[in-house]
Regions:
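A short local loop/turn or secondary-structure capping micro-motif enriched for an aromatic residue
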Residues: 74, 91-92, 176-179
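Generic alpha-helical secondary structure
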Residues: 101-108, 139-143
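Second-shell loop/turn segments in exported
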Residues: 93-101, 130-134
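Short intrinsically disordered coil segments
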Residues: 55-56, 97-102, 182-187
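Short beta-strand-centered interaction patches in the first periplasmic/extracellular domains
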Residues: 79-80, 86-87, 121-187
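Assembly/oligomerization scaffold segments
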Residues: 1-90
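Glycine-rich, acidic and aromatic/proline-enriched surface loops and short helix-turn segments
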Residues: 103-120
């Protein structure tokens, strides 16, 4: 059973949008972009939508996606389309960043703190990275460069993703499924 729990940030009211949805599209990407859920609803609903309000998507009681409302499109044919993105979207903004004697866990934590993002487990090797001086660069690119340098120094490949509302940094061996299927997977 699919559940799409939406909570309005201003009123605190909560709805299960699965009961009034016509179509649900879950989009994932391997790197460089945020995951998203796009929901098409019948306009007969009395739900008030506020940007930044959270959505929890569960399938058979398993946590699939947690994101925030970023787009509302009202259509003439009595439908509304909502788009929610996970926290990775906020890392696509350009920032200036300076760090010295830090490891990738500390860099992710510092950047997430600057954006007021929630952090989960950060399980990267604690190798000290070269000094970081970045100007007007995407926060996600800064993190990716730190992950790349950690790979070179430690030999450990790292994965950064939003695990149901918490930025998580780990190695593929710590993931529940250790296969990647897609255009770049060579499968």
């Amino acid at each position: 059973m699919m559940q799409l729990f939406y909570q309005n940030n201003k009123t605190g009211d909560t709805w299960d949008l699965a009961t009034v949805s016509e179509k649900v599209e879950f989009k994932t990407t391997r790197k460089g972009s945020a995951w998203s859920v796009e929901i098409t609803l019948y306009n007969s609903t009395k739900v008030a939508f506020e940007y930044g309000s959270p959505l929890a998507f569960k399938l058979d009681d398993k946590e699939v996606f947690f994101g925030y409302l970023t787009k509302v499109k009202y259509e003439k044919d009595t439908k509304t389309t909502l788009t929610f993105h996970d926290q990775i979207k906020y890392l696509l903004r350009n920032i200036n960043f300076v760090a010295r004697d830090k490891n990738v866990n500390q860099i992710v934590s510092a950047i997430a703190g600057d954006f007021d993002l929630k952090i989960g487990e950060l399980k990267a090797p604690a190798v000290t990275l070269s000094p970081q001086l970045k100007e007007d660069k995407k926060a996600l690119d800064i993190i990716q460069e730190a992950m790349d340098e950690t790979l070179v120094q430690s030999g450990e490949l790292l994965v950064l993703y939003d695990k149901f509302g918490e930025l998580t940094l780990t190695t593929p061996k710590n993931l529940p499924i250790q296969y990647i299927i897609g255009n770049e997977s060579f499968m």
